[in-house]
Amino acid sequence: MQQERKVQHVFLVGAKSLGAYGGYETFVYKLTEYHQNNKNIKYHVACKANGDGCMDESKLDGVRKISDTEFEFHNARCFKIYVPQVGAAQAIYYDVAALNECCKYIEKNGIKNPIVYIMACRIGPFAKHFYKKIHKLGGRVYLNPDGHEWMRAKWSAPIRKYWKISEQMMIKWSDLDICDSVNIEKYIHECYDRKGIKGRNPKTTFIAYGADLTLSKLSDDDKRLLNWYKEKELSKKDYYLVVGRFVPENSFEIMIREFMASNSKRDFAIITNVNEKFLGELERKLHFKQDKRIKFVGTVYDQELLKKIRENAYAYFHGHTVGGTNPSLIEALGSTDLNLLVDVGFNQEVAKDTALYWNRSQGSLAQLINKVDNIENDKIIELGKKAKERVSKEYTWKKICDKYEKVFVK
């Protein structure tokens, strides 16, 4: 393959797909979207071909099919990796298989100076192998260390121990750690300074995630919106909202329990890709199906519709307790006026005084819901204005993607 030296090839490994609700999936979608006409960068994106959170490109507009396992979207080459159902090891298998595919492609096509950007610290035991292999091919390894994968509630104690060790190994065998939170960058230096290759400190930089501040193109009487409201039995400013991956550390159990305990007459709309096992577990604990206000409304891939649903929510819940700068939170600050966040350092770092906070103890969120259910509209408007000002100053996707361009092509 003939290639011009000025084009920087960047291989993105770690996101399951593009345009779903996970942080990395949102990031990859936006990064490729903002750089789709950038002649200096060519992205190659690994996607899951099967299983939980897998890529379904039929739900995206503007896809050009190359083969059964490859397609082009936002001018990025997206390649699908089949993952056998091997339990918790799936995530490790996926990243290893994707990296092997990257190395094969780089070698076969004679790509000069590639960057392989790995998202999350899942493959520590293989980090040295791939670091050396990619360096031998003339490339560099960049890492997004995510936010404390070893703390996530869904993992058992042995698996959490593995993630912690894996994190240390991956930070050691990387050329640059791109942290999406100041707290994460600080943590890396506190834990891993003098533990890099030959006792060096890890090289880090901070680039947050972004949000789109433009209003939805849909009007309040748009048929798509009205049909969705009718189907889900919701109405404007009469529902609390959450959008995010359906995993325990995102506080779904607490949010549902506390909403059920509140006196609100509004609904609680949950936009997520439901995991039946976790859903069944929540039903056994909470019996939420008896509360007609609790509504699992499925997924929304139409970005304009999703934006309008956010704008029209009475309030937004954010229960993420693990991770850095979460895209779903920034999108909420940019589109929903009233945001109710679990009180952890990452969320405080992003939202500061533009949101209201609750803790995970029983009664905290229910009390806050009862309070804000009757809050003065002027107060809501004031919080919304402050939130949008904060996002426009620090977290626009243009600003974030411009920073990534500088890191990738410098």
Task: Identify the role of each PLM range.
Residues 47-52, 211-212, 243, 267-282, ...:
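Glycosyltransferase donor-sugar binding loop
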Residues 90-102, 113-146, 324:
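An aromatic- and histidine-rich active-site surface loop
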Residues 308-324, 337-338:
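Acidic donor-binding loop of glycosyltransferase active sites
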Residues 355-363, 371-377:
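Conserved acidic donor-binding segment of nucleotide-sugar-dependent glycosyltransferases
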Residues 5-7, 12-21, 34-88, 184-191, ...:
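N-terminal strand-loop element at the rim of the active site
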Residues 10-13, 229-250, 256-263, 269:
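Conserved donor-binding/catalytic core segment of Leloir-type glycosyltransferases
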Residues 159-177:
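Membrane-proximal helix-turn-helix segments that form the acceptor-binding/catalytic region
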Residues 172-203, 211-216, 404:
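A short, active-site helix/loop in glycosyltransferases that binds the activated sugar's phosphate group
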